[in-house]
Curated annotation (Swiss-Prot):
The lineage of its organism: Eukaryota, Viridiplantae, Streptophyta, Embryophyta, Tracheophyta. One of its GO terms (biological process) is cytochrome b6f complex assembly. This is Protein COFACTOR ASSEMBLY OF COMPLEX C SUBUNIT B CCB2, chloroplastic. Its main location: plastid. It comes from Arabidopsis thaliana. Disruption phenotype: High chlorophyll fluorescence phenotype due to an impaired photosynthetic electron flow. Seedling lethal when grown on soil. On agar plates supplied with sucrose, seedlings grow very slowly with a chlorotic phenotype. Deficiency in the accumulation of the subunits of the cytochrome b6f complex and lack of covalent heme binding to cytochrome b6. Residues 87-93 are lumenal. Residues 20-65, 115-275 are stromal. It comes from the Eukaryota.
């Protein structure tokens, strides 16, 4: 499936409506689970999860740099603390070790340079509601899969908002620009109405907006400050061409938030929900 990288404004079917300023309210909403029998296939296949230490504020992409600092410091300490004369072979070994340490330190910067742009860090929106809504008309196994998928997308990427639609049923998680005086059922229906108005259910090609910003944009369910948007359609694995089963949408407050590796990984997550 091809990916369209869009650097032009995206105009959905409904216009941007002015909204009043309000402070951030953080809460979670979820539909009541209907009692259904659980199957043995309830757990999400975690093979798509990426490695992380889980340390708040620690960027694992800079791990080679810290390793280089550590080994380089040990080599220098060993060199200056040696009491015996240093042989020529030891000097060559230390020079090679310092060269490898320097390369390890520079590796994260080289990686960003080769990508062609610097990926910014996400920031939480100043406005918006943090919500968690799952349709009640789906089975417990699919609910668990959707809950895990949205969690790992928020945890392992720069995403601040994720929406998954599977056969018309929704799972919405993260920060969204939604009303704050609605019940759980009303909030779910509100998101479903907005999705129908936007027309994302009819998208058949992967869309990526690395510079989703500006007043001309009108996707008003996203929080203010959204700068990147990625939409992955869920095309059914049938002989019928281009039969869409739903879509996966992620948004970030960082520009160029989703690299080729990120988009491939999100696509692997979407594979879990294809028909």
């Amino acid at each position: 499936m091809s990916i369209q990288i869009c650097n032009f404004p995206f105009h959905p079917k409904f216009a941007l409506q002015p909204r009043a300023q309000r402070s951030t309210r953080i809460f979670a909403r979820t539909e009541n689970d209907s009692p259904q029998s659980k199957t043995s296939d309830q757990q999400l296949n975690l093979s798509v999860l990426r490695f992380t230490f889980g340390i708040p504020g620690f960027d694992e992409s800079y791990l080679p740099r810290w390793i280089g600092y550590g080994f380089g410091s040990l080599l220098l300490l060993n060199h200056f603390s040696a009491s015996a004369p240093i042989s020529e072979s030891q000097m060559r070994s230390e020079a090679l070790g310092l060269s490898l340490a320097a390369f390890s330190i520079a590796l994260p910067y080289i990686g960003k340079f080769l990508k062609g742009s610097v990926v910014e860090q996400r920031s939480l929106p100043e406005e918006g509601e943090q919500v968690f809504v799952i349709s009640s008309n789906i089975g417990d196994s699919l609910k668990e899969d959707l809950a895990w998928a949205t969690y790992v997308l928020l945890r392992n990427t720069s995403t601040i908002a994720v929406l998954i639609s599977v056969q018309g049923e929704l799972c919405v998680r993260g920060y969204w620009n939604c009303p704050d005086q609605m019940s759980k059922a009303q909030l779910h229906d509100w998101f479903k109405k907005k999705v129908d108005e936007i027309g994302l259910a009819d998208v058949k090609e992967t869309l990526y907006f690395p510079q989703y910003a500006g007043s001309a944009l009108s996707l008003d369910i996203l929080p203010d400050g959204t700068r990147s948007l990625f939409v992955q359609p869920l095309v059914q694995n049938t002989n019928e061409p281009q039969k869409v089963n739903g879509f996966l949408l992620v948004a970030s407050t960082a520009g160029y938030a989703y690299s080729d590796k990120d988009r491939a990984w999100i696509g692997a997550m979407a594979e879990k929900f294809r028909g």
